[in-house]
């Protein structure tokens, strides 16, 4: 990104094993750096997996991990919602977890950005 500062980069799965303390410096250094929040919650990752690797979870059915919530609210222009669910049977559950666990725990302004406005802006959609 240093070689091409105007390039945009979306970190898939927000890095998978990263914490907010890993991502924030990248946001501060690179204005065109973004994270998608897919594959960091159930049902994409089975709940039992988070027992052994709790750092993988950003949000779940009951809310957002505190450090992540703080960063998403602080820098809402840098996050995009995602599911990565390819199994139709799990899609409805994934959307429910996103709506209740993620979007249901953010301010209305942040919800709009994370849910759709950031994607519209980033991808030039109208």
What residue ranges belong to the model's regions?
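Short histidine/acidic/glycine/proline-rich micro-motifs that form metal-
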Residues: 41-42, 85-87
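Catalytic pocket-lining loop regions of alpha/beta-barrel enzymes
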Residues: 1-80
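Mid-to-C-terminal alpha-helical segments outside catalytic/metal-binding sites
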Residues: 66, 70, 74-80, 86-126
């Amino acid at each position: 990104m240093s070689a091409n500062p105007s390039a945009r980069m979306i970190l898939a799965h927000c890095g998978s094993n990263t914490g907010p303390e890993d991502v924030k410096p990248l946001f501060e250094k690179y204005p065109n750096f973004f994270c998608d929040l897919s594959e960091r919650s159930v049902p994409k990752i089975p709940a039992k997996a988070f027992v052994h690797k709790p750092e993988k979870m950003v949000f779940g059915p009951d809310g957002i991990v505190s450090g992540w919530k703080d960063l998403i609210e602080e820098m809402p222009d840098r996050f995009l919602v995602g599911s990565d669910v390819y199994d139709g049977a799990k899609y409805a559950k994934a959307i429910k977890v996103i709506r209740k666990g993620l979007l249901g725990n953010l301010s209305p302004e942040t919800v709009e950005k994370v849910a759709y406005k950031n994607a519209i802006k980033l991808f030039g959609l109208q």
